[in-house]
C-alpha cells in the first residue's frame, strides 16, 4: 500500500509541506519580448534630442534603458557601460542585480567643475561623447525624480599615480619633488582623472568618416551580429551607445589650464596596449612612450603649464588582443623583418590599423584645447586628426632612443617609414635590414 500524508513520519510531512508551499520564482521580465520598435508605434514618444543645443535642458537627456517606464521615451540605441553592459546582463540573469535597479548618485559629483564651453554646443566638434555626461544627476534631476533611468557617461575624480619609471626619475633627480604635482620621494603624482563612455551622434560620426548615415547604421547592425535592430528600424533615433571601451584622461596641473592658451600644454594621446602598458612586453614602444608622456606632462605642470594623457581602449590597434598575438606569431615565424611589419597584420586582419583617429579629438574639444605646445606622439594619424579639427600642434616630441626596447626596433622603423614623425630617415631598403629576435 502506498504511503499517504497521514502515514508518513512527521519530518517527511513537514518537508513535503515545505516543498508544496515554496513560492514559484517570478520571471525577471513579465511583459512580452520587444525585439525592436518603430517610430510609428502608438506608444513611442522619445524625449527630444537636440544634439548641439545651447543648453543641457534644450539638448535633452540621453535615455537608452528598456525599462517599462523608459522604453517608449528612449532616444538612444545601445546600453550604458560600453563593453561592460554584458556583465550587467549577467548580474541580472544570475539574480545579483534587480533589472529595475536605480543608482544612488549622492556624493558622486565631479571633483572639478569644468566650465561649459562653446565646443559643447558644436555638433561638428563633439560627436563621440555626451558633453553633459558628467552633469546628468543634476541637470536632468527631474527625469530621475520621475522614475526615468538616465545615467552619467562621464565621471571626474582626483587620484595619485604611482609609476615605477617615475619613481626612478625622482630617485635620480631628473624629476623634482615640488609637493603639488610630484608629491614625495616615492614619486606619487597628483592628477585629475576623467572617465568617458562613448556616446555617438550618428550623423556626426558618419560625416567624420565620410560616409552617409544609412551606410554607417547598416554596417554597425550587420558587423555586430544584428544586435541592435533599432539602428535600422528607428532612423529617428540619432544617438548610439556602442558596446566598446571608452577613454580615461589624466590631467596634470590645474584642469582650467587646458583651455587657457596662455599656458603651455603637453599632451600624450595613447591607445591601449595591455601587453606592454601593464606587463612590459618589449615587442613595442607602448609603455616606454606612455611613461615618457606621463613624466613630460608632469614636468609641464611643474613649469607652470599643464599636462594631459588620454588613454583610449583600442587594444591591438582596435583589432583586439587575439588578432594581435596571431600577428606576432606570423611575424616571429617569418623572420620578423620591418619590411613585412604591416604586411603580416594585413594578411590576417585585412587592414593594418582600425583605430581610425577621426573621433579622438572630441575629448580635446571638450576640454577646450585650442593648441598643443608639445605633442608627445610620433603618429601621423593622430597628428592629422587633431590638426584637421582646428587644434594647433606647435612641437612634436619623439620617444628618446634610449627608451626603445631592442625588439621593438622593427615596429618603430616600420612606422617611421610609413609616415611617423621623426628626424631619422628610414627607407624601404633600410627596412629589410631590421629584424627582431625569433622569440
Swiss-Prot record:
It is an enzyme of class 3 (hydrolase). GTP binds at residues 268-272, 315-317, 377, 382. GO terms for biological process: riboflavin biosynthetic process. GO terms for cellular component: cytosol; nucleus. It comes from the Eukaryota. Residues 1-24 are annotated as: Disordered. NCBIfam families: PRK07198.1. Belongs to the GTP cyclohydrolase II family. The active site is at 353 (proton acceptor), 355 (nucleophile). This is Uracil-regulated protein 1. Its EC number is 3.5.4.-. It comes from Schizosaccharomyces pombe (strain 972 / ATCC 24843). GO terms for molecular function: GTP binding; GTP cyclohydrolase II activity; metal ion binding. It is found in: Cytoplasm; Nucleus. Induction: Strongly increased in response to uracil. The keyword Magnesium does not apply. Its main location: cytoplasm. Pfam families: GTP_CH_N, GTP_cyclohydro2. Keywords: Cytoplasm, GTP-binding, Hydrolase, Metal-binding, Nucleotide-binding, Nucleus, Zinc. Zn(2+) binds at residues 273, 284, 286.
Amino acid at each position: 500500500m502506498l504511503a499517504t500524508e497521514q502515514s508518513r513520519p512527521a519530518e517527511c510531512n513537514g518537508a513535503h509541506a515545505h516543498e508544496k508551499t515554496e513560492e514559484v520564482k517570478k520571471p525577471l521580465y513579465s511583459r512580452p519580448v520587444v525585439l525592436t520598435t518603430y517610430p510609428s508605434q502608438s506608444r513611442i514618444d522619445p524625449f527630444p534630442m537636440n544634439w548641439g543645443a545651447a543648453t543641457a535642458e534644450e539638448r535633452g537627456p540621453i535615455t537608452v534603458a528598456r525599462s517599462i517606464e523608459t522604453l517608449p521615451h528612449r532616444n538612444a540605441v545601445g546600453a550604458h557601460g560600453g563593453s561592460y553592459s554584458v556583465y550587467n546582463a549577467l548580474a541580472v540573469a544570475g539574480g545579483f542585480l534587480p533589472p529595475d535597479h536605480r543608482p544612488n548618485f549622492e556624493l558622486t559629483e565631479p571633483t572639478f567643475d569644468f566650465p561649459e564651453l562653446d565646443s559643447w554646443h558644436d555638433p561638428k566638434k563633439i560627436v563621440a561623447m555626451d558633453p553633459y555626461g558628467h552633469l546628468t544627476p543634476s541637470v536632468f534631476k527631474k527625469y530621475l525624480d520621475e522614475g526615468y533611468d538616465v545615467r552619467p557617461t562621464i565621471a571626474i575624480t582626483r587620484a595619485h599615480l604611482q609609476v615605477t619609471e617615475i619613481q626612478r626619475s625622482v630617485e635620480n633627480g631628473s624629476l623634482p619633488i615640488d609637493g603639488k604635482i610630484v608629491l614625495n620621494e616615492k614619486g606619487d603624482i597628483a592628477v585629475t582623472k576623467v572617465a568617458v563612455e562613448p556616446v555617438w551622434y550618428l550623423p556626426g560620426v558618419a560625416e567624420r568618416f565620410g560616409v552617409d548615415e544609412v551606410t554607417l547604421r547598416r554596417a554597425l547592425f550587420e558587423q555586430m551580429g544584428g544586435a541592435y535592430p533599432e539602428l535600422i528600424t528607428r532612423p529617428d533615433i540619432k544617438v548610439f551607445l556602442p558596446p566598446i571601451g571608452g577613454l580615461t584622461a589624466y590631467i596634470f596641473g590645474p584642469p582650467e589650464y587646458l583651455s587657457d592658451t596662455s599656458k603651455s600644454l603637453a599632451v600624450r594621446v595613447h591607445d591601449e596596449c595591455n601587453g606592454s602598458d601593464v606587463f612590459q612586453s618589449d615587442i613595442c614602444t607602448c609603455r616606454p612612450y606612455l611613461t615618457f608622456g606621463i613624466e613630460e606632462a608632469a614636468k609641464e605642470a611643474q613649469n607652470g603649464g599643464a599636462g594631459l594623457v588620454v588613454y583610449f581602449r583600442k587594444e591591438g590597434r582596435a583589432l583586439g588582443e587575439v588578432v594581435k598575438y596571431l600577428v606576432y606569431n606570423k611575424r616571429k615565424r617569418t623572420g620578423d623583418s620591418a619590411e613585412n611589419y604591416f604586411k603580416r597584420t594585413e594578411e590576417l586582419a585585412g587592414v593594418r590599423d582600425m583605430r581610425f583617429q577621426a573621433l579622438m579629438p572630441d575629448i580635446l574639444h571638450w576640454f577646450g584645447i585650442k593648441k598643443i605646445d608639445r605633442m608627445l606622439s610620433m603618429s601621423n594619424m593622430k597628428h592629422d586628426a587633431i590638426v584637421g579639427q582646428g587644434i594647433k600642434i606647435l612641437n612634436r616630441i619623439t620617444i628618446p632612443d634610449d627608451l626603445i626596447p631592442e625588439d621593438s626596433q622593427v615596429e618603430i622603423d616600420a612606422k617611421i617609414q610609413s609616415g611617423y614623425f621623426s628626424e631619422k630617415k628610414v627607407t624601404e631598403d633600410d627596412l629589410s635590414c631590421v629584424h627582431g629576435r625569433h622569440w
